[in-house]
Amino acid sequence: RLLMVRQYRNALERYTLELPAGKLDDPKEEGIVCAARELEEETGYRSDKLEWLITLRTTVAFCDERIEIFAAHDLIPTRQNLDEDEYIDVKAYTLDELKKKIFSGEIEDSKTIAAIMAYAVKYNR
């Protein structure tokens, strides 16, 4: 099962279903450190077993943004630590449920789609 977050996105003026994500606190911060922090802050779970999955370049014609995707295994419950303006619901889904949500259009976030599909390929699911 994969943990997903449902949160309101102002740019779309609606809620979206995404994988937990965030940005580096400092340009020198390692992606895996950021991933661990954001996982715990947004979901209330931590993992001592984060594994690099893929690196994405979002729009190579326009910017140099890079997104690193990690898979978190053996989750340990802690507690959410949300920003004042964050309201996030957390729910676990099977990979098959998430694939259906992608192809029905319920999941539109590109990093989430890429991560789910990469996970499915890597783990032959």
What are these regions (language model features)?
Residues 1, 8, 72-77, 95-96, ...:
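Short loop segments at secondary-structure junctions
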Residues 1-37, 75:
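Conserved Nudix-box catalytic region and its N-terminal flanking loop in Nudix hydrolases
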Residues 15, 52, 60, 85-125:
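Nudix hydrolase/Nudix homology domain
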Residues 18, 69, 92:
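Short aromatic/basic micro-patch
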Residues 46-53:
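A short coil-to-beta-strand element that immediately follows conserved catalytic motifs
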Residues 59-79:
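Active-site-adjacent beta-strand/loop module that shapes the phosphate/pyrophosphate-binding cleft
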